Amino acid sequence: MKLTCVLIVAVLFLTACQLIAADDSRDLKRFSRRKMRDGMLNTKNTEEGCLPPLSLCTMADDECCHDCILFLCLVSP
């Protein structure tokens, strides 16, 4: 009886882990289309104000620098 309960709990636990770790492919498709659209909208005129990667930034300094960590711009599209 104890072994059966332990097996049931183990199966439920492993099932929950699988559900938590599963990818949601619908989100990936939505974000890839958004990135493609944003890439098409960015022209040379809009890229002039962007900071290069690893340059100094502030929190509200540049709209192109999405991650300003320790005053460094880490991601610049």
Swiss-Prot record:
S-S bonds: 50-65, 57-68, 64-73
Chief place of localization: secreted
Alphabetical UniProt keywords: Disulfide bond, Knottin, Neurotoxin, Secreted, Signal, Toxin
GO molecular function terms noted in the UniProt entry: ion channel inhibitor activity; toxin activity
Domain of life: Eukaryota
Record flagged with keyword Nucleus: no
UniProt subcellular location: Secreted
Keyword Ribonucleoprotein (UniProt): no
Propeptide: 23-44
GO CC annotations on file: extracellular region
Residues making up the signal peptide according to the UniProt record: 1-22
Tissue: Expressed by the venom duct.
Listed InterPro entries: Conotoxin
Notes concerning its domains: The presence of a 'disulfide through disulfide knot' structurally defines this protein as a knottin.
Family statement drawn from the similarity comment of this UniProt entry: Belongs to the conotoxin O1 superfamily.
Name recorded for this polypeptide: Conotoxin ArMKLT2-0122
Species this protein is from: Conus arenatus (Sand-dusted cone)
Lineage, uppermost ranks: Eukaryota, Metazoa, Spiralia, Lophotrochozoa, Mollusca
